[in-house]
Design a protein with these regions (language model features):
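Transmembrane alpha-helical segments in multi-pass inner-membrane proteins
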Residues: 150, 165-225
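Cytosolic-side transmembrane-helix boundaries in multi-pass membrane proteins
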Residues: 123-137, 209-248
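Helix-loop-helix "hairpin" substructures at the membrane interface of multi-pass membrane proteins
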Residues: 25-27, 31-33, 39-44, 91-165
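Alpha-helical transmembrane segments within multi-pass membrane transporters and channels
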Residues: 24-63, 201-202
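Hydrophobic alpha-helical transmembrane segments
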Residues: 8, 12, 27-35, 57, ...
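Transmembrane helix-bundle core of multi-pass membrane transporters
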Residues: 51, 55-112, 140-141, 161-172, ...
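Single transmembrane alpha-helix segments in multi-pass membrane proteins
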Residues: 1-23, 48, 180-193, 197, ...
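Membrane-interface helix caps of multi-pass small-molecule transporters
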Residues: 19, 42-50, 72-73, 107, ...
Length: 248
């Protein structure tokens, strides 16, 4: 399953973090987006499992709802993070938080039952189910954990950008493609090592590419074209065609 509510989750969690920091300081800045992101992930997983429809459709539809909440939370205005609570936007604090997220994700995938079952479901859902894995349960867990990490990203996003604008009409979707490209890159090269390492390398390559465009003064339209082509190529490399199927 795919989660296309990444952008909406980050936008709403960032807004919640900014508002919470005004009342609770750094405690609110850290705890509020983690709770918000986790709850959004849990909702995504439950709705996806209960409705039995494509995760793309479910998360796109839910993104509209989360964006509406972001408009309500800001009254249509920008929220600005106080200068007293921007430490996570500066080096080395931002790097430390990113490293913690990386180590936590790698640990979950490699050393826990959740990681083992996630790999099994991702490789072959039918086989995993026949082996006794509670597939619906662990899909919900995967969505929930993803939401937690989106909450972590929200902390970095609001701290670095210092402000956040509410989203509407799926405008938050623009935030989805960079992390998706890194994820597909990780899937393409996971056989050569740990997938989390591959994802980090993929994201670094993508950011270097974007920074190169900025340095060259390339227009945004060209950047979007290259991003789209790169996404298609990476997805093509990670997709396993099934032969012998007859479309009726």
């Amino acid at each position: 399953p795919f989660d296309m509510s990444v952008g909406a989750n980050i936008v709403l969690s960032s807004i919640i973090a900014c508002n919470a920091s005004e009342k609770f300081g750094y405690a609110g800045l850290i705890i509020a987006p983690l709770i918000c992101g986790t709850i959004i992930g849990l909702i995504n997983g439950i709705v996806y499992i209960k409705l039995h429809i494509s995760s793309l459709i479910v998360t796109c539809a839910l993104s509209l709802i989360y964006e509406a909440f972001s408009v309500y939370a800001t009254n249509g205005k920008n929220v600005i993070l106080s200068a007293d609570y921007r430490a996570f936007g500066d080096y080395p604090v931002n790097l430390i938080l990113a490293l913690i997220a990386y180590l936590l994700c790698a640990f979950i995938l490699k050393y826990t039952k959740i990681g083992t079952y996630t790999y099994a479901i991702g490789s072959n859902e039918v086989v995993a189910k026949n082996m006794g894995v509670n597939v619906p349960k662990y899909k919900i867990v995967a969505f929930t954990l993803a939401g937690f990490f989106f909450g972590l990203q929200a902390i970095l996003t609001i701290s670095f950008g210092t402000s956040m604008t509410s989203a509407s009409n799926l405008s938050s979707m623009s935030r989805n493609f960079t992390p998706l490209m890194g994820t597909f890159f990780g899937l393409a090269f996971k056989k050569y090592g740990h997938p989390v390492i591959a994802i980090v390398i993929g994201e670094m390559i993508i950011q270097l590419m974007f920074n190169g465009f900025v340095a060259l003064g390339a227009p945004t339209t060209i950047q979007n074209v290259v991003t789209g082509v790169a996404l298609l190529v990476i997805v093509a490399l990670t997709t396993k065609p099934v032969k012998g199927l007859v479309v009726k």
